[in-house]
């Protein structure tokens, strides 16, 4: 029984964040801490006497081991990518050598990390030249990831994570007796079977960005693409990573094939991507959509609310899944 006020998700006051964090970093005097973006996590822009920085306050459900993995990966990638055009966001090191701080929040403990502000502009990947360059950058990122060893525990971007866990969340939200559940179970089972069959052919497996749809990657300064937001990075199929680029929505429909061809040509100019891997792209585009449905459900109770996730939302996904004709 709750007898005291509780919060599911708070927005922390910038003044509180400055009080908690400014003493830990050698980034100059804080002149401004501005609430910048509400996403899965909260983002603030910091302006100091030394320049601009980005502060991420992770949602309460993100555990310390998850943040430690992400920031360790970024630190290692900075070294591995030093000789190529591709870059990643830079976590700022605290005076005592730590990369993050655990904060008290109304809903519980939340973790905060500060990153150097990215210069440049977002490339919308609307032309062949940009897509070819972005393909090269994605390949350089995967090549660097192949040279990295991560010792922290981490989930895998496998069929269990993408499909099985998503199905469990969706069914839990809808209820076992909902008329769409039997179809969703059958669809998920068929999708799992197809993924396992494709994987048995020997797909490229390694550390992935995990959210490579372009919005987290296409920040460009000259010839440099900078990749950021590695929250979903883990071991997985590289075809899944590239499927997110293939499924990018912010491109004209009649240009998508030409842009994809340019992207994959750029990727293959740096590292191999087999015919088997490319043949799995469409399958992983479907898997990504099923995972997105599960992600929607995961944030209804404490972020987005149920209003926009009713029967119309469900029917949209069901009709989309039926259109794939995998069952």
Predicted regions located by residue number:
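ATP/Mg2+ or Mg2+-diphosphate-binding catalytic cores
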Residues: 5, 292-327
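A cross-family kinase active-site recognition segment
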Residues: 95, 124-182, 205, 308, ...
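Active-site acidic catalytic loop and adjacent metal/ATP-binding pocket
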Residues: 37-49, 54-55, 91, 192-240
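Active-site activation/catalytic loop segments of kinase-like enzymes and analogous catalytic loops
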Residues: 239-272, 287-304
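Juxta-kinase regulatory segment immediately upstream of eukaryotic protein kinase catalytic domains
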Residues: 1-32
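An alpha-helical support segment within catalytic cores of ATP-dependent transferases
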Residues: 12-24, 146-151, 165-210
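ATP-binding pocket architecture of kinase catalytic cores
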Residues: 49-150
